[in-house]
């Protein structure tokens, strides 16, 4: 079984998906981590962190590196790089590289392969998870929140290294890019459960989702 969670950046997808995976006993996957790892690969390939590389060059670089899945984490050449991919430098470039159709195809293929060759249940979160990657998921969720709430969440995650105004501006740019992508854009899919998390705590959101999930299972019996 797959529970797919979609929504904009900093809407709570990762935190909620992780918590739900514990409560429901599902494995957790974040597609965003894959795109961030690929962005890290790109950044390691040139001197200036403000430069961008072409799609063909990035596709070749990805093929030269080993991205593997271990339990609930993606590894780059056997290394857990989570502490290297959650920063403003990655934030600035990840939407650009994730707009490359070839890169999206690689990520989507890897996600589907992980699920295909496993008997486990999964909670998978990320943009376009409910529309492109796993539109047939048994339960689809779209999490949302106001731009100010999302900026505040990101501010707390980053220990105040950027101002709220900078984070809000970055998120607005990210939203605009994500909603206007040629392929895999951010949008509501048919049959999705929409939930605004702006003024709800983690436990409250998880309880609402679990209640809705259990009700859906009862109705489908």
Curated annotation (Swiss-Prot):
Assigned keywords, A-Z: ATP-binding, Cytoplasm, Kinase, Nucleotide-binding, Transferase
Record flagged with keyword Cytoplasm: yes
Listed EC numbers: 2.7.4.25
InterPro entries membership: Cytidylate_kin, Cytidylate_kinase_dom, P-loop_NTPase
EC supergroup of this enzyme: transferase
Family matches, as CDD domains: CMPK (cd02020)
Recorded GO CC terms: cytoplasm
Chemical reaction(s) catalysed: CMP + ATP = CDP + ADP; dCMP + ATP = dCDP + ADP
GO biological process, one term: pyrimidine nucleotide metabolic process
Source domain of life: Bacteria
Keyword presence, Repeat: no
Main localization, broad class: cytoplasm
SUPFAM superfamilies xrefs: P-loop containing nucleoside triphosphate hydrolases (SSF52540)
Coiled coil feature spans: none
Localization annotation: Cytoplasm
Binding site for ATP: 7-15
One annotated GO molecular function: ATP binding
HAMAP family for the chain: Cytidyl_kinase_type1 (MF_00238)
NCBIfam families documented for this protein: cmk
UniProt similarity note: Belongs to the cytidylate kinase family. Type 1 subfamily.
Stated name of the protein: Cytidylate kinase 1
């Amino acid at each position: 079984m797959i529970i797919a969670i979609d929504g904009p950046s900093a809407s709570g997808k990762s935190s909620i998906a992780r918590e739900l995976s514990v409560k429901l006993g599902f494995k957790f996957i974040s597609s965003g981590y894959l795109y961030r790892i690929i962005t890290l690969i790109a950044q390691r390939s040139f001197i200036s962190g403000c430069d961008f590389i072409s799609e063909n060059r990035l596709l070749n670089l990805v093929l030269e590196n080993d991205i593997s899945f271990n339990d609930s984490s993606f590894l780059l050449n056997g290394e857990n790089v989570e502490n290297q991919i959650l920063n403003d430098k990655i934030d600035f470039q990840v939407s650009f590289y994730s707009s490359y159709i070839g890169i999206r195809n690689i990520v989507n293929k890897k996600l589907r392969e992980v699920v295909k060759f496993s008997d486990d249940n999964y909670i998978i979160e990320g943009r376009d998870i409910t529309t492109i990657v796993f539109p047939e998921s048994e339960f689809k969720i779209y999490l949302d929140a106001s731009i100010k709430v999302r900026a505040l969440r990101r501010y707390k995650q980053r220990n105040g290294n950027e101002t709220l105004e900078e984070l809000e501006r970055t998120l607005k740019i990210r939203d605009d890019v994500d909603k206007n992508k040629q392929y895999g854009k951010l949008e509501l899919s048919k049959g999705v459960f929409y939930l605004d998390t702006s003024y709800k705590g983690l436990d409250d959101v998880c309880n609402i989702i679990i209640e809705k999930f259990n009700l859906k299972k009862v109705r489908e019996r």
